[in-house]
Curated annotation (Swiss-Prot):
Keywords: Prenyltransferase, Repeat, Transferase. PFTA repeats lie at residues 85-118, 120-153, 178-211, 217-250, 293-326, 394-431. This is Protein prenyltransferase alpha subunit repeat-containing protein 1-B. Coiled coil: none annotated. Belongs to the protein prenyltransferase subunit alpha family. One of its GO terms (cellular component) is cytoplasm. Residues 363-383 are annotated as: Disordered. InterPro entries: Prenyl_trans_a (IPR002088). Gene3D superfamilies: Protein prenylyltransferase. PROSITE patterns: PFTA (PS51147). GO terms for molecular function: protein prenyltransferase activity. SUPFAM superfamilies: Protein prenylyltransferase. Pfam families: PPTA.
Length: 431
């Protein structure tokens, strides 16, 4: 009994030390364990150095069961905890075990009651992800909090009779960029972090509203990352999502894009300014150029890193998007329409409608708009000059590329993947 009392006193002190560390430095950005089998000094096991919080490993076997059991007793109504105690206990527990759903649910209740600032939970989740970057419960709770934060922003703007609409829109975009950074850090800490990349897609769909500028910016910003992580399926899948979303924008096929909720959609939400949304969506982009550049990047990576199946799987998906683009435009073309010719995968000529031709004849303006009177951003305008759509997107060019790989490569894995890709190409074309 005496030993249990000593442990309880120790654990209570550790919880207070963790709470005190956050009060002394609210900018803590990383948490980690310090290997220490035994307590060698009579001091706190919580170490704070600049913005890094360390926990000596010897205390975990006492600390984690204590806060876990304490929270369960509270949920079973066998123990009363006041507001501050609940916040401290759940914070400590989630930093050590962020997949404990009950703790997140308790914090949801605190947020709903107005006791806990939801921004604090975003900070806690971000910190937990530095130690547990794949924690599914942390990502799930983060999405719930983000929805609530944006809802509060929207309601505040509506109550204010649109007085703060521009500020609200900018704040939402700031949240989007912050989430992109959180996802980037988590993806770098854990290979093929599906949860991180899935959250990134969710943010673009539900907070970014699938606007064109964000899609293109993300395509550009992740190029270097995937070049450094050539075996990361999730990272390449994210780029496939971006290109597919741009394809759906081009074809105006809303059925192929996940529906955006009314939370921030302009048509249903008067809070977001129509002109600001137009600036984000009326950006000229050259989809054939983007697809061709993706194929070039893929080929460079295949040459530099032979034998990686991820790269071949990605090439399949990009060529499939090219095939879909050519097929859709071929079906929608009319004899009266102004057209541009592109060689499709079968060697035939697809005549593109005048609507699509406007995309392939204009430079891709990332930060600006076609109308100089509607410049919504003061950033330096970035333009990518498009090259004519070449035969590099055709089936024949792909077959020549595969033959070159099979002839020159020395990697048996590369040869096997190339042969499998050729078989897939021929089946796609109906051979």
């Amino acid at each position: 009994a005496e030993w249990k009392e000593e442990v309880e006193v120790l654990v209570q002190r550790v919880v207070k030390d963790i709470t005190g560390a956050f009060r002394r430095n609210p900018n803590i950005d990383e948490i980690g364990l310090i290997p220490c089998p035994e307590a060698t000094y009579n001091r706190s096991p919580i170490v704070l150095v600049e913005n890094k919080l360390g926990v000596e490993s010897w205390c975990i076997k006492f600390l984690l069961p204590y806060v876990h059991n304490k929270l369960l007793l509270y949920r079973q109504k066998k123990l009363w905890l006041n507001r501050d105690e609940l916040i401290d206990v759940t914070c400590t527990l989630l930093l050590l075990n962020p997949d404990f759903t009950t703790a997140w649910n308790v914090r949801k209740e605190l947020i709903q009651s107005g006791t806990l600032n939801p921004v604090k939970d975003l900070q806690l989740g971000k910190l937990a992800l530095t130690k547990f970057p794949k924690s599914p419960e942390t990502w799930i709770h983060r999405r719930w909090v983000l929805q609530r934060v944006v809802q509060e922003l929207v309601v505040a703007a509506v109550v204010g009779k649109d007085a703060t609409c521009p500020e609200t829109y900018e704040r939402i975009q700031t949240i989007v960029q912050e989430e992109m950074h959180v996802c980037y850090e988590a993806a770098g800490r854990y290979p093929s972090n599906y949860n991180s990349w899935s959250h990134r897609i969710w943010v673009i769909q539900h907070l970014g509203n699938l606007n064109v500028k964000l899609l293109i910016d993300e395509l550009s910003s992740t190029k270097h990352w995937v070049s450094m992580h050539v075996s990361d399926h999730s990272g390449f899948h994210y780029r496939q999502f971006l290109l597919k979303s741009l394809l759906c924008k081009t074809l105006k096929d809303s059925d192929n894009v996940t529906a955006v909720p009314d939370l921030i959609a302009n048509e249903k939400n008067p809070c977001l300014p129509r002109e600001g949304e137009a600036i984000w969506n009326q950006i000229c982009f050259d989809l054939p150029y983007l697809l061709e550049e993706e194929m070039k990047l893929n080929r460079e990576l295949l040459d530099s890193y032979p034998g990686h199946e991820t790269l071949w799987c990605h090439r399949r998906q990009i060529f499939k998007l090219i095939h879909q683009l050519l097929l859709e435009q071929s079906q929608s073309a009319t004899p009266q329409s102004t057209s541009a010719s592109i060689t499709d995968g079968s060697g035939n000529i697809s005549h593109l409608s005048s609507t699509f031709q406007s995309y392939v004849t204009n430079p891709m303006d990332v930060d600006g708009m076609s109308d100089p009177n509607k410049q919504g951003y003061t950033q330096e305008t970035k333009r990518l000059k498009r090259a004519p759509v070449q035969d590099s997107l055709s089936l024949d060019s792909e077959l020549r590329f595969i033959n070159c790989v099979l002839t020159n490569c020395c990697s048996p894995e590369q040869s096997r993947f190339a042969a499998s890709y050729r078989k897939w190409l021929l089946s796609l074309q109906g051979y």
